[in-house]
């Protein structure tokens, strides 16, 4: 008999542009007799649960509609939760993409007798899986399946013999953990921090400008001239902090489809040109963290596709994360805390008892997971500099990031009692390290040491500035990962300017030799720059 094996699980993730708007560019067989509506009066933005329409003919709560025309303007499918006749449709999950005014909303065929399947469900014509990314070489996942708060109530005088009288449903929470995975590229780094911009080296081909605004959530757009643009090449749109690189999937006249939606808005007439490696990815802080979706596919031992158990978690944020490495090992990361707004899955159930709130979604589709072929970042390839001094004998280090996320539960019409939103609290950074002491020096030497810096408390001639930290991993030519503290690389006195401070640096006496110091460091911000051959970062 076939069984579900943990070593046959596929895990992948994708970014979200609007909270809860998972990116699933799917299409299905249209129901010719059921054109539900047409969006005409407004655009529909990523993260919206409700879209405006000019009609709701044949709209039925619980049925599915495809938003967008296959191979033309990008498509996705959502389930109708409610509607206002002739005005709007509200879905069970937020939409993931940007949709122009006038986009067709079409009912799609489903088979709900026993299988709960959707007829003709597949990827949209001119794109790729948008939830295809893997964070690295991982081994275990604490899956964010819902935790149900069932609350017993004790009433006086009901003859319950000290037992609770009745149990009531409370809130649902979803939180997962992906621990101790080896970094193979910089994909997962931005999610506990903020945004990413990507630039490439100009290839000398395909130079043009954008024709019309590109909105976050689009994966098709117009340019003034498509001359020199070829499918499977890479295109950079915009420059500086707004630059994004995407793979060209299809070119039709001056219209271009790319492999992944844009995460940022881009103004009309900005530059777009074909680029090649190396690519430089700059990760900078943002007040609001990027959203993230996870998908887990449990395959059985016979690898029978119809037995795949798919679970998709959306509306997530990475609340706590660590970066760690130790001698003889590799650079590893953990997403320590990842709360989500909700989930769906492909386990069909039409029973009256469980179907109303079981989170089934017929649009669940297995993705082809993209697995990097790059080497890890080895500890031996790293270097750490603090207060201008490179430390050659670092035994281990850990960088901690805490966003103090708080899921909130507001009044809503949903019966699921899941979080309404997840808000960021104060951001906290810290770093710990074990550093073997350098060769002995005369007590009169002027060399800066951990002990001296501890006593200095970051207070120098220029004021209470703290100090800089530079952490660099070099895998090869044009292949580096650089973490800089503070984010602009220059510590200075005053608010929003300081660098790092040593809170403790204990050099204890033990049986281990040579002597080492356990360092605890506080800092207020950082920036990360990754140079590699990966063009598209989620």
Would you name each region that the model predicts?
Residues 1-44, 48, 58-82, 86-538:
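Signature of extracytoplasmic/envelope-associated structural regions
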């Amino acid at each position: 008999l076939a069984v579900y094996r943990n070593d046959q699980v596929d895990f992948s993730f994708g970014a979200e542009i609007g909270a809860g708007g998972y990116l699933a560019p799917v299409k299905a067989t249209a129901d010719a007799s059921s054109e539900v509506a047409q969006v005409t009066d407004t655009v529909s933005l990523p993260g919206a649960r409700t879209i405006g329409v000019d009609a709701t003919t044949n709209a039925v709560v619980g049925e599915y509609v495809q938003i967008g025309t296959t191979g033309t303007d990008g498509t996705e499918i959502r389930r109708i939760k409610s509607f206002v006749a002739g005005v709007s449709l509200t879905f069970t999950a937020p939409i993931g993409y940007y949709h122009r005014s006038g986009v067709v909303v079409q009912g799609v065929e489903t088979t709900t007798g026993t299988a709960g399947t959707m007829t003709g469900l597949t990827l949209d014509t001119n794109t790729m899986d948008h939830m295809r990314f893997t964070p690295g070489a991982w081994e275990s996942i604490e899956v964010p399946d819902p935790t149900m708060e069932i609350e017993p109530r004790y009433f006086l005088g009901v003859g319950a013999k000290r037992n609770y009288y009745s149990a009531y449903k409370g809130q649902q929470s979803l939180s997962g953990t992906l621990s101790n995975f080896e970094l193979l590229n910089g994909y997962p780094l931005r999610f506990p921090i903020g945004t990413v911009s990507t630039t490439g080296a100009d290839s000398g081909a395909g130079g043009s400008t954008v024709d019309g605004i590109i909105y976050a959530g689009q994966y098709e757009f117009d340019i003034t001239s498509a001359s020199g643009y070829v499918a499977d090449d890479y295109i950079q749109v915009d420059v500086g902090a707004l630059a994004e690189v995407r793979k060209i999937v299809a070119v039709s006249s001056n219209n271009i489809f790319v492999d992944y939606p844009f995460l940022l808005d881009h103004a009309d007439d900005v530059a777009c040109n074909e680029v090649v490696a190396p690519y430089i990815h700059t990760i900078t802080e943002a007040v609001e963290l990027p959203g993230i979706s996870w998908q887990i596919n449990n395959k059985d031992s016979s690898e029978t596709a119809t037995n795949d158990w798919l679970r998709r978690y959306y509306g997530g944020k990475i609340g706590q994360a660590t970066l760690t490495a130790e001698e003889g090992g590799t650079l590893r990361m953990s997403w320590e805390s990842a709360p989500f707004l909700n989930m769906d899955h492909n386990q069909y159930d039409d029973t009256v008892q469980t179907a109303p709130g079981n989170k089934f979604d017929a649009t669940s589709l297995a993705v082809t997971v993209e697995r990097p072929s790059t080497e890890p970042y080895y500890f031996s390839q790293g270097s750490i500099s603090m207060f201008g001094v490179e430390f050659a004998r670092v035994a281990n280090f850990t960088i901690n990031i805490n966003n103090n996320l708080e899921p909130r539960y507001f009044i809503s019409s949903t019966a699921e009692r899941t979080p309404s939103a997840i808000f960021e609290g104060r951001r906290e950074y810290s770093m710990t390290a074990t550093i073997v002491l350098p060769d002995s020096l005369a007590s009169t030497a002027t060399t800066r040491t951990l002990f001296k810096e501890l006593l200095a408390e970051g207070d120098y001639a220029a004021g209470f500035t703290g100090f800089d930290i530079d952490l660099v991993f070099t895998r090869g030519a044009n292949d580096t990962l650089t973490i800089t503290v503070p984010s602009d690389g220059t510590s200075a006195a005053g608010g929003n300017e300081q660098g790092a401070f040593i809170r403790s640096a204990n050099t204890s006496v033990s049986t281990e030799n040579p002597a080492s110091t356990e360092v605890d460091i506080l800092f207020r911000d950082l920036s990360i720059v990754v140079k590699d051959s990966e063009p598209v970062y989620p």
